[in-house]
Curated annotation (Swiss-Prot):
One of its GO terms (biological process) is autophagy of mitochondrion. GO terms for cellular component: mitochondrial outer membrane. It is a multi-pass membrane protein. This is FUN14 domain-containing protein fndc-1. It is found in: Mitochondrion outer membrane. The keyword Mitochondrion applies. The chain crosses the membrane at residues 37-56, 61-78. It comes from Caenorhabditis elegans. Coiled coil: none annotated. The gene is fndc-1. Belongs to the FUN14 family.
């Protein structure tokens, strides 16, 4: 355990303890795939739990914001502040669809998901489990 309150012998350079703590954290994070599987699982679970908790709490705020924005847009359309040219929207959507399909069909799709998942399987497994724990805690 790193003591964050230690000082550098009174020389006025506080923060050596914080520097040591940051170095310790970076040691585990930078080369995480080289660590033991249980360390990878633990780090993934920790980050997943925090992420799941904040996604659940923040998701309510985002949902409320999107809902209120949608209602305000519908009210503005109803009152005539906003007018939609549906034929122009349809034409632009067709052009966008053609453009995307031309770009996608001409290129080979690179599949990196298999190697990524197999390389980081312990971290991803811990993260997924941590997300579920974070969802249940929130």
């Amino acid at each position: 355990m790193v003591d964050l309150s230690k000082n550098d012998g009174g020389s006025g350079k506080a923060g050596k303890g914080v520097s040591d703590a940051i170095d310790t954290v970076l040691y585990y994070v930078v080369d995480l795939k080289k660590q033991q599987p249980m360390v990878q699982l633990g780090v993934g679970a920790g980050f997943g739990t925090v992420t799941g908790y904040f996604v659940t709490k923040g998701g309510r705020l985002v949902a409320a914001t999107v809902g209120i924005s949608f209602l305000l847009a519908q009210f503005a359309i109803h009152k005539g502040y906003i007018t939609l040219n549906e034929s122009k929207i349809e034409r632009d959507m067709k052009n966008l669809h053609k453009s995307v399909m031309n770009k996608v069909s001409g290129k080979k799709v690179i599949n990196i998901s298999d190697s990524f998942v197999s390389e980081y399987r312990w971290i991803l497994g811990g993260f997924a489990a941590g997300m579920l724990i974070g969802f249940s805690v929130a």
